[in-house]
Curated annotation (Swiss-Prot):
Its EC number is 2.7.7.6. InterPro entries: DNA-dir_RpoC_beta_prime, DNA-dir_RpoC_beta_prime_bact, RNA_pol_asu, RNA_pol_N, RNA_pol_Rpb1_1, RNA_pol_Rpb1_3, RNA_pol_Rpb1_3_sf, RNA_pol_Rpb1_4. Binds 1 Mg(2+) ion per subunit. Binds 2 Zn(2+) ions per subunit. The gene is rpoC. Its cofactor is Mg(2+); Zn(2+). It comes from Yersinia pestis. Belongs to the RNA polymerase beta' chain family. GO terms for cellular component: DNA-directed RNA polymerase complex. This is DNA-directed RNA polymerase subunit beta'.
Length: 1406
């Protein structure tokens, strides 16, 4: 028996491999795989059910139908193994060879492989340099192609129609050779000399100048070189032998009633064989040409359908009008081999059930129904029963378990102890969607879940179901316990904050417990400690909220672990003293001496984790939960209708609003305001009224009057249940209370526009029919949105995972000095995100210098933890250069220092961590919370849009950056630069506020000036763009001819006249070439020069500019010469939410992108064309100018003669990330994408760490375009992997040769996924056919670097615990050791493992 096992093992041995190569199969190769030719289309004999000989299921070719038994039954049993039966010709072996052995069909006529023909760009077409239409006409026997021209005037590859061919035959006879069909194409491909062709093309490439031609040549050269290097022969793209899939992979299953269910492939193969045999017969009979041709065409079509049905012409359908599933369909799409069977498999040993609350569980436990546990752990129980000698055989054990004898339950208890199970809730959006717990057996049929892990699973108990999986092997159990246990996943990988935070009841309980109340029972007592506080509370001598003095002993520990103990009498409340009893030692009392809301509790857990570590935090979290539930139950905070107090002022406010609306309506009817203005104003009025009602209501709800001990009335925070729920963060929000007790306010239509009649009622008063009807609009839209959102969000996550899946931490330090400069995110007057939050957990890229000195505050390569961040804050540092994955120099993967802290663990990241997948999940998981809609700016929003001044909020000093200004006669500054930034610095040098100052703004105070809070520092008119003069002098009109370039207009109200410059479209013939301008001259009439240049001060005026000055008037620097009216940006739609995130990651170019200056230099305008202006930028160093045509309707931000820097905005609009990368570099584009994505998430209140977005950006920047190949093998204009280019350049630099130069490319995530090095990963993502075709032609090797490829080939992934295994393999390979394959059979190994496990279980008894 042992020998037999050894033999079996030898059969199933897998070779260790490092890479997978895909290439074209040559006919000989196909024959070498084959075990015989399939000659007949028959499948099985319908009477005997035996396979027909030489048919598609033939036992002689493919192997026996039953194990170790030949077809005719002469040889049965194992002893005849390997014998070939002389009667039926079947080899006696296992039947599973029918899954492995292939057959083949010898085609009577060559056939083109449809993938290489039709998959665009057509490989055959590109190789032969013939259009696809022509090749198809040849293949499907419509025309001839010349193969050898001989001495005639016919070109090779020339297409001839039937008539032309006959004419040529008459004229030249046998001089030339022309054929039709696949034979012709095959002959053409065979005759190609690839290397010679390559040389010719390279020469052509050097000579040609046309861009399109270059592109085409490069494509052809790449393809030819791929063929040469891979050893593929072009003629192999034409099939002469067709392989036949093993029969068990295209089974034929008998159904009841004598019918059969068959795989579609059998039908397709039958067609091919039938047509092939018919063609052979016709050729033997020497049938007329036309019949043979027709048959050949039919054969070509049959082979096409087998390989890829529906790719050409109509798909071949089966009996039920459904297209047949071809070989290509088997592998592509969601139901294909890749996604259905290789990347996601079904799991045995799993169960699922509804979940319910387990409030008494510990954090690492889950309640598992006994019935389910018994089923899941059956094999373990059988083993235990046998081991104990309670059952003699497995069968007996089975019976015992089925009878559910008492001993079985005892054994189940033992088996389950210390054996973790995995719980998973679909959809698993991030890695916390599967966690491990220790099961506790419970009665009933529902799984019990610990309430604190609900946030991670996004679970609630309204009928959610969860799946249970059992890790079987020791390794799996170890990983479940060490890595996946719920107690090890306290922090969220997305932002590093605790994810095990109490919510709802628990928060309410703690909040209620820690509130204080004036004049409560027992106020003013002095207690000896928390124990006494609890005693008097239980005895009913004092209320929970009573303000008392308590003696507290606290041990305060800082992050270094030093601790000091101090005892003091503290003013606090009874409830807080009781809560202090569960707080672990080492935290200060101040942490509970406050009303605890959700934020405070989260902060408390975070502090606890940072100071005390994992174990105390877990215990503390559990205690918080138990306490919270207990006191929430005691609080009796329930909601009654009287809790929704409607403010008395409501009626008055609504009345006022209605009068205002009526007034506006009158103005509209008398024609004073436009319809649009009326609508906007009405909406503004109602929005303001709603705010006022809400404010009145909240003021009313949030405080109550009480009498204190001295009999004086004072106000205290209200104990209204609804208010407490919202205030603590347990449930509900001010906006929801507003709908209950204020007014519902304005509603939106499904298209997002606002209905102008608001709902003045609230839910307590109830809605009337009209109000209810208006409400339904929004509600239904919400439901429809949610459904769409889920699908879109899931697809975004899938693309993100796909692009980042191969990014793993592979080394400790790449040694780079590059990084990105982090500053706090400031919008207007608010610090949206302080510097501390942005740099926490990053590594410094260079020393941080103490502001105002030369001392080093933080050395280079320091991981900034909480301590360092405190130091930065104390010294008010406001920018730090930190390492980033975008600038990491590691070739494949990233280094730990560039990534920084592992957010879910709180220390620097470990090698082998799959940061790419974590990033993708962190960005994708909150996707369902983002909105789907496009916002219309209307009403309230548009008011904010047209700002006209900057008012600072805090006291401090001003700091202007990128500023140019002139001082006008009044001594004020007039800004003449485009992207000026104004910052407000406090006395510690920290940036508090930041604003953009537009061109032409007037500022009373300049750089460095002190300002008070609330002071207005800049003013401008938002509706016009001024032209500001930088010099003083007299105005001289140039080319300002009345009626030709300008026209006079008189304002009806004021009677003032002004000149308006005509648009070039409105000018008459002679005025077209004139360029109206204002020159500034001195008293003598000489040109005044612009300070610091030798250019005369003259200001060209664009069309529509308004001039209110007369010729010859004296003006001073900083005066406005002309005004250009700005069309208000109107109601532009802002794409928000999920679509915006998708657009950013797909790097889509916006519809009308901002135009950026390509080079630095001076602006001027060249000759105009009909619809466009010519913008010319002349560099200051006098090199060649850059020209660009810009449509006339685009508003330009620059005037003639202005100096711009490369990358400055010339015309406003959304910026295109590609332009930013080209003109401002990698860091600018990283910053842009990060900030824009964060903006969307910040609106929804979702926190995601920047580094996740940077990880995705790094993957988008993987490719570069070669500008100059140097001594490398790259082609100019070729897109190559950056890591490849860098490696090649390093090698060349070492040899002292010319390195390649390149520009970085930004690819969208879908494109980047498809352009990955690994063809297996790309094929399993999208466009499987195209990817595989391309890879096969190039003979690509997949190095199996990423996670996906390794999952697909069935290996451990090179990340996490599999990282060590792969490193070990690499090391052995480098040392040239043979792979260690244990010479044990599978059965032996299982037996050994069972012994080990059982031994382990046996010892547990004691």
């Amino acid at each position: 028996m042992k020998d037999l096992l050894k033999f079996l093992k030898a059969q199933t041995k897998t070779e260790e491999f490092d890479a997978i190569k895909i290439a074209l199969a040559s006919p000989d190769m196909i024959r070498s795989w084959s075990f015989g030719e399939v000659k007949k289309p028959e499948t099985i004999n319908y009477r005997t059910f035996k396979p027909e000989r030489d048919g598609l299921f033939c036992a002689r070719i493919f192997g026996p139908v039953k194990d170790y038994e030949c077809l005719c039954g002469k040889y049965k049993r194992l002893k005849h193994r390997g014998v070939i039966c002389e009667k039926c010709g079947v080899e006696v072996t296992q039947t599973k060879v029918r899954r492995e052995r292939m057959g083949h069909i010898e085609l009577a006529s060559p056939t083109a492989h449809i993938w290489f023909l039709k998959s665009l760009p057509s490989r055959i077409g590109l190789l032969l340099d013939m259009p696809l239409r022509d090749i198809e006409r040849v293949l499907y026997f419509e025309s001839y192609v010349v193969i050898e021209g001989g001495m005639t005037n016919l070109e090779r590859r020339q297409i001839l129609t039937e008539e032309q061919y006959l004419d040529a035959l008459e004229e030249f006879g046998d001089e030339f050779d022309a054929k039709m069909g696949a034979e012709a194409i095959q002959a053409l491909l065979k005759n190609m000399d690839l290397e010679a062709e390559c040389e010719i093309l390279r020469e052509e490439l050097n000579e040609t100048n046309s861009e399109t031609k270059r592109k085409k040549l490069t494509k052809r050269i790449k393809l030819l070189e791929a063929f040469v290097q891979s050893g593929n022969k072009p003629e192999w793209m034409i099939l002469t032998v067709l392989p036949v899939l093993p029969p068990d992979l295209r089974p034929l299953v008998p159904l009841d009633g004598g019918r059969f269910a068959t795989s579609d492939l059998n039908d397709l193969y039958r067609r091919v064989i039938n047509r092939n045999n018919r063609l052979k017969r016709l050729l033997d009979l020497a049938a007329p040409d036309i019949i043979v041709r027709n048959e050949k065409r039919m054969l070509q079509e049959a082979v096409d359908a087998l390989l890829d049905n529906g790719r050409r012409g109509r798909a071949i359908t089966g009996s039920n009008k459904r297209p047949l599933k071809s070989l290509a369909d088997m592998i592509k799409g969601k139901q294909g081999r890749f996604r259905q069977n290789l990347l996601g498999k079904r799991v045995d040993y799993s169960g699922r059930s509804v979940i319910t609350v387990g409030p008494y569980l510990r954090l690492h436990q889950c309640g598992l129904p006994k019935k389910m546990a018994l089923e899941l752990f059956k094999p373990f129980i059988y083993g235990k029963l046998e081991l104990r000698g309670l059952a003699t055989t497995i069968k007996a054990a089975k019976k015992m378990v089925e009878r559910e004898e008492a001993v079985v339950w005892d054994i189940l208890d033992e088996v389950i102890r210390e054996h973790p199970v995995l719980l998973n809730r679909a959809p698993t959006l991030h890695r916390l969607g599967i966690q491990a717990f220790e099961p506790v057996l419970i009665e009933g049929k529902a799984i019990q879940l610990h309430p604190l892990v609900c946030a991670a699973y996004n679970a609630d108990f309204d009928g959610d179901q969860m799946a249970v999986h059992v890790p079987l092997t020791l390794e799996a159990q170890l990983e479940a316990r060490a890595l996946m246990m719920s107690t090890n996943n306290i922090l969220s990988p997305a932002n590093g904050e605790p994810i095990i935070v109490p919510s709802q009841d628990v928060v309410l309980g703690l909040y209620y417990m820690t509130r204080d109340c004036v004049n409560a029972k027992g106020e003013g007592m002095v207690l000896t400690g928390p124990k006494e506080a609890e005693r008097i509370y239980r005895a009913g001598l004092a209320s929970l909220h009573a303000r008392v003095k308590v003696r507290i002993t606290e041990e305060i520990r800082n992050t270094e672990g030093e601790s000091i103990t101090r005892t003091s009498i503290i003013d606090t409340t009874v409830g807080r003293a009781i809560l202090w009893m569960i707080v672990p030692q080492g935290l200060p009392y101040s942490i509970v001496n406050q009303p605890l809301g959700k934020k405070a509790i989260s902060k408390m857990l975070n502090t606890c984790y940072r100071i005390l570590g994992l174990k105390p935090t877990v215990i503390f979290a559990d205690q918080i939960m138990y306490t919270g539930f207990a006191y929430a139950a005691r609080s009796g905070a329930s909601v009654g209708i009287d809790d929704m107090v409607i403010p008395e002022a409501k009626a008055g406010i609504i009345e006022e609003a209605e009068t205002e609306v009526a007034e506006i309506q009158e103005q509209f009817q008398s024609g004073l305001v436009t319809a649009g203005e009326r609508y906007n104003k009405v909406i503004d009025i109602w929005a303001a009224a709603n705010e006022r009602v809400a404010k009145a209501m909240m003021d009313n709800l949030s405080v109550e009057d009480v009498v204190n001990r001295d009999g004086v009335v004072e106000q205290q925070v209200s104990f209204n249940s609804i208010f407490m729920m919202a205030d603590s963060g347990a449930r509900g929000s001010a906006a929801q209370i507003r709908q209950l007790a204020g007014m519902r306010g304005l509603m939106a239509k499904p298209d997002g526009s606002i209905i102008e009649t608001p709902i003045t009622a609230n839910f307590r008063e109830g809605l009337n029919v009209l109000q209810y009807f208006i409400s339904t609009h929004g509600a239904r839209k919400g439901l429809a949105d949610t459904a769409l959102k889920t699908a879109n969000s899931g697809y975004l996550t899938r693309r993100l995972v796909d692009v980042a899946q191969d990014l793993v931490v592979t080394e400790d330090d790449c040694g780079t000095h590059n990084g990105i400069v982090m500053t706090p995110v400031i919008e207007g007057g608010d610090v949206k995100e302080p510097l501390r939050d942005r740099v926490l957990g990053r590594v410094t890229a260079e020393e941080v210098i103490k502001p105002g000195s030369a001392d080093i505050l933080v050395p280079r390569n320091t991981l900034l933890d909480e301590k360092w961040c405190d130091l930065l804050e104390e010294n008010s540092v406001d920018s730090v250069k930190v390492r980033s994955v975008v600038s990491c120099e590691t070739d494949f993967g990233v280094c730990a220092n560039c990534y920084g802290r592992d957010l879910a663990r709180g220390h620097i990241i470990n090698k082998g961590e799959a940061v790419g997948v974590i990033a993708a999940q962190s960005i994708g998981e909150p996707g369902t919370q983002l909105t789907m809609r496009t916002f219309h700016i209307g009403g309230a929003a548009s008011r904010a849009a047209a700002e006209s001044s900057i008012q600072v909020k805090n006291k401090g000093s001003l700091k202007l950056s990128n500023v140019k200004f002139v001082t006008n006669a009044a001594g004020k500054l007039v800004i003449t630069s485009r992207n000026t930034e104004l910052k407000l610095i406090d006395e510690f040098g920290r940036t508090k506020e930041s604003y953009k100052v537009p061109y032409g703004a007037v500022m009373a105070k300049g750089d460095g000036a002190e300002v008070q809070g609330g002071e207005t520092v800049a003013n401008w008119d938002p509706h016009i763009m001024p032209v500001v003069t930088e010099v003083s002098g007299f105005i001289r009109f140039a080319d300002m001819v009345d009626g030709q370039t300008i026209t006079r207009q008189t304002d009806e109200l004021t009677g003032l006249s002004s000149l308006v410059v005509l648009d070039s479209a409105e000018r008459t013939g002679s005025g077209k070439d004139l360029r109206p301008a204002l020159k500034i001259v001195d008293a003598k009439g000489n040109d005044v020069l612009i300070p610091g240049t030798d250019m005369p001060a003259q200001y060209f005026l664009p069309g529509k500019a308004i001039v209110q000055l007369e010729d010859g008037i004296q003006i001073g620097a900083g005066d406005t010469l002309a005004r250009i009216p700005q069309e208000s940006s109107g109601t532009k739609d802002i794409t928000g939410g999920l679509p915006r995130v998708a657009d950013l990651f797909e790097a889509r170019r916006p519809k009308e992108p901002a135009i950026l200056a390509e080079i630095s230099g001076i602006i001027s305008f060249g000759k105009e064309t009909k619809g466009k202006r010519r913008l010319v930028i002349s560099p200051l160093d006098g090199s060649d100018a850059y020209e660009e045509m810009i449509p006339k309707w685009r508003q330009l931000n620059v005037f003639e003669g202005e100096v711009v820097e490369r990358g400055d905005v010339v015309s406003d609009g959304p910026e295109s990330p590609h332009d930013i990368l080209r003109l401002r570099g990698v860091h600018a584009v990283t910053r842009y994408i990060t900030n824009e994505v964060q903006e969307v998430y910040r609106l929804q209140g979702v926190k995601i760490n920047d580094k996740h977005i940077e990880v995705i950006v790094r993957q988008m920047l993987r490719k570069g375009t070669i500008v100059d190949a140097g001594s490398t093998d790259f082609l100019e204009g070729e897109q190559a992997e950056m890591s490849r280019v860098k490696i090649a350049n390093r090698k060349l630099a070492a040899e002292g040769k010319i390195e390649a130069t390149f520009t970085r490319d930004l690819l969208g995530i879908t494109k980047a996924s498809l352009a990955t090095e690994s063809f297996i990963s790309a094929a399993s993502f999208q466009e499987t056919t195209r990817v595989l075709t391309e890879a096969a032609v190039a003979g690509k090797r997949d190095e199996l670097r990423g996670l996906k490829e390794n999952v697909i080939v069935g290996r451990l992934i090179p990340a996490g615990t599999g990282y060590a295994y792969h490193q070990d393999r690499m090391r052995r390979k480098a040392q040239g050791e043979a792979p260690v394959v244990p010479q044990v059979s599978a059965d032996e190994a299982t037996a050994n493992l069972a012994e080990l496990l059982n031994a382990g279980f046996g010892n547990n008894k004691g």
